[in-house]
Amino acid sequence: AGHDAIMTPNPYAYLDHYQEEPEIAPVTIGGYNTLKKTYSYNPVPADADSLVKQHIIGVQANCWAEYMPTEDNRDYQIFPRLIAISETGWTPMKKKNFTSFCNRMVEDFQRLEAMGVKPCLNFFDVNINTRATQEGVLNVELETFYPGAQIYYTTHGEQPSIHANLY
């Protein structure tokens, strides 16, 4: 018994949400859903019973276009996250590997460019993640998804260069 289901949860599969900081991104409906978060989605929860698991037959990405007046806006909102949700649909969770995905994304970006698609390019940016501890210490982590990229930083407000500290 039961009904088949296509999984399309708001926190992972809505491509009309911001995928980079709202201050630098085109206006969207709201929400925040990064490439990494989209890729991390497991449509078949590990704690689901076998009856539920057998009825999960796919995933779906959603994109409401009321904040995307042009094709360039739509490209930016949809890509590269659509590639991540697609891989989620055909790859079992235990075989997914974000580092491998990022390595393959370099070629996917070249393919998108050749087709005239204008994706969000924050894949190539340095992301700054912060987390406050219970002791009141602010931890800062820098990351980029671009394979092999080196991150240089300064602590005195100057623009980093290859002569700055290597992260």
Task: State what each model feature region is.
Residues 2-110:
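Conserved alpha/beta catalytic core and glycan-binding cleft of carbohydrate-active enzymes
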Residues 92, 96-167:
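Short, compositionally stereotyped local motifs that mark structural "simplifiers"
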